[in-house]
Regions:
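Conserved beta-strand hairpin/beta-sheet module of binuclear metal-dependent hydrolase folds
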Residues: 1-30, 115-131
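Active-site environment of divalent metal-dependent phosphoester hydrolases
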Residues: 46-50, 71-73, 111-112, 135-137, ...
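Cap/insert and terminal regions of metallo-dependent hydrolase folds
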Residues: 137-175
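Active-site metal-binding motif and surrounding structural segment of the metallo-beta-lactamase
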Residues: 20-67
Length: 175
């Protein structure tokens, strides 16, 4: 789980769930200037969303943004981050970074305090919500007016059942 969102000279990562080298390689393959990445916005503390966050923050000297509960759940998993690069935000407030405005909103997930993001340029709005099992009224309201919506809430039932997850985790994923 890792998305690059850019507008003009501002780029951000939504999650960094891959190894840092893989994120860097993907950005380079997309012919995007990695130096335009100005921050990493985390949706929740699960490893498939934070694996490369610390590495990318240290490599690019950029901040990681997450709400308080997510920071509490991930700070021991991402390595040492400069204090000035540890940004705690409040859900449902709008933050500016370069030429983008980013507004986190709550989503249901079995994590500390998962969020989706509304991202605004001076022209358009886009929304990203990952690991959602169902659409709540809050999600529906936050997606309204978006020119682009990225939703991720799937799994392959055969892969899941044949995989090495515990039965309890398989039941959670299927819920």
């Amino acid at each position: 789980n890792c998305h690059v969102v850019s507008y003009k000279d501002t780029g951000i990562l939504i999650d960094a769930g891959l190894a840092g080298k893989r994120i860097t390689s993907g950005i380079e393959q997309a012919d995007f200037d990695i130096d335009k990445i100005q921050g990493i916005f985390i949706t929740h503390e699960h490893s498939d969303h934070i694996k490369g966050a610390g590495i990318m923050s240290r490599k690019l000297d950029i901040p990681i943004y997450a709400n308080f509960k997510t920071w509490c759940g991930m700070k021991d998993k991402i390595g040492n981050i400069k204090e000035e690069n540890m940004i705690v935000f409040d859900n449902d407030k709008t933050y500016e970074l370069g030429e983008l405005k980013i507004r986190p909103f709550s989503i249901p997930h079995d994590s500390e305090d998962a969020v989706g993001y509304n991202i605004y340029s001076d022209k358009e709005k886009m929304s990203i919500a990952t690991d959602i099992g169902y659409i709540t009224d809050n999600i529906r309201n936050n997606l309204k007016g978006s020119k682009l919506v990225v939703l991720e809430s799937n799994y392959d039932p055969n892969m899941l059942m044949m995989g090495s997850y515990t039965y309890a985790l398989k039941k959670r994923v299927m819920s």
